[in-house]
Amino acid sequence: SACVAWSGEHGNTRRRFYDPERGYFRTTRICSFTRMEALQHEMIDIINNLPDYTKVGLASFSTSGYRNNKVWEDSRNELAELGPSNSETRQSAIRFVNSLSNSDPKYWGGTMPWDTLDAAFSDRLTDTIYFLSDGKPNKDRDGFTWSSNDYDSVADHYAALNASRVSDGDKSIKLNTTSVGLNSEWMQLLSSKTSGEYIRVDDI
């Protein structure tokens, strides 16, 4: 995973990290916390603060075939009601989020959110999406190399899905985005066109 903050100290072993500009590398520098840890902290905070009656679905988006391309079993078939803070359902949701860092980062996969977002927009009960990411997509919606030319088309696509939902008598979806460890212009645009909020998280 990418390191958000380095401690300034060095350890005895070399660990593997990711840099968006140079790819994967190994170093003895000690990382205070990674983007994945910041993302998990933010998501768990969201889960802990949702009302008991909230029905949620959780999914992590990644490259097909990789370990972090998965859904939370409790919401595989339908949204699950969280219940009280000590409920098994809420604790299961937190365990799912924590499981995202269980393996070596090389097995996590890339950033491919389209199928997951489309599935969320097709659920008639969904009214809010919390979309967290620590990187830019590997490919655009058509499978081509991601570029700044995709920013508007992606935001327009989900704005159009919202318009279709309203015309079908469903609620529009508020898409809140959280960018972890970097500024994300395309996520800002995505939220602005779906009445959501964009935030950037740099620490835990």
Model-inferred region functions:
Residues 7-10, 103-105, 135-201:
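VWA/integrin I-like adhesion module and closely mimicked acidic/polar interface patches used
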Residues 33, 44, 75-130, 137-139, ...:
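Von Willebrand factor
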Residues 65-70:
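Secretory-pathway/luminal and periplasmic proteins that interact with or process carbohydrate-rich
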Residues 34, 75, 89, 149-154, ...:
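Alpha-helix capping and helix-coil boundary motifs
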Residues 1, 39, 58-61, 120, ...:
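DG-centered beta-turn motif at the end of beta-strands
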Residues 53, 126, 170-172:
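A general structural motif
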Residues 42-53, 61-64, 96-103, 119-123, ...:
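Structured segments of extracytoplasmic/periplasmic soluble domains
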Residues 2-58, 81-89, 101-111:
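…and closely analogous acidic/polar surface helices at protein-protein or active-site interfaces
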